[in-house]
């Protein structure tokens, strides 16, 4: 838990939330990896990405670390990143995630296996989601997967609410600071044969969902301005989750 709490925090007053040098190097290597892994890569709906505000990209999750790779390489924004907690504790991988300021999240599945208390997980997750929300409100991009885990099923798994709660908190931060409200951006990820080397990938950016700014409660706005995590209203979270189910 101490290692998770000591995860480097992103900075939103420069070009990249993480280290500029390591971020540029990581994305260079990712582009070479994508060019080697895929025979063709196609993007559509780029005109649907608003460039005057932050956005949270949400997609189904069938191809592990390849899924965020396809989204981030095409998106015009720099990204603030979050993911399951072991991304920042595993050897080799943690070297990169810590330099990119990836924020760890402890899922319920990991909590049941032990390693930390529910209170510690709640505090860590609240800090991470609030940090991601601050980055989105500051105009950066972010990608989170509502299913919560990568899988090889032919249908979507039950959606978690973390991405919806995060983007609503980002909207509260933006509204309280006079910035433009961020959007939730549905993304379609398509692979000709998902597990094949040199297959084809198609990334489809759907029309963004503009959040209901007038429905964001004042107590949520005041809490996030104090850097305190408060859960957004359940009805707003569920309506946004149901809307995402239709479009992802």
Please state what every model-predicted region is.
Residues 246-248:
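Conserved small/polar residues in nucleotide/adenosyl-binding loops
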Residues 230-234:
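N-terminal assembly/attachment segments of tailed bacteriophage virion structural proteins
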Residues 1-20, 24:
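Eukaryotic N-terminal low-complexity, Ser/Thr- and Lys/Arg-rich leader segments
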């Amino acid at each position: 838990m101490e290692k998770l709490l000591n995860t480097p925090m992103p900075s939103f007053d420069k070009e990249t939330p993480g280290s500029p040098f390591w971020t540029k190097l990581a994305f260079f290597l990712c582009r070479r990896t994508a060019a080697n892994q895929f025979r063709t890569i196609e993007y559509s709906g780029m005109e649907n990405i608003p460039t005057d505000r932050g956005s949270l990209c949400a997609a189904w999750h069938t191809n592990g670390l390849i899924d965020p790779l396809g989204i981030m390489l095409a998106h015009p924004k720099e990204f603030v990143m979050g993911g399951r907690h072991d991304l920042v504790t595993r050897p080799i991988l943690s070297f990169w995630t810590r330099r990119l300021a990836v924020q760890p999240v402890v899922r319920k599945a990991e909590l049941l296996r032990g390693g930390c208390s529910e209170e510690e997980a709640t505090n860590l997750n609240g800090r991470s989601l609030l940090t991601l929300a601050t980055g989105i409100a500051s105009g950066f991009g972010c990608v989170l997967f509502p299913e919560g885990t990568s899988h090889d099923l032919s249908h979507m798994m039950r959606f978690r609410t973390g991405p919806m709660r995060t983007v609503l908190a980002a909207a509260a931060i933006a509204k309280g600071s006079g910035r433009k409200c961020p959007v939730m951006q549905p993304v379609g990820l398509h692979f000709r044969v998902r597990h094949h080397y040199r297959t084809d990938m198609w990334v489809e950016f759907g029309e963004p969902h503009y959040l209901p700014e007038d429905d964001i409660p004042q107590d949520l706005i005041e809490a996030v301005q104090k850097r305190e995590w408060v859960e957004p209203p359940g009805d707003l979270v569920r309506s946004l989750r149901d809307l995402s189910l239709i479009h992802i």
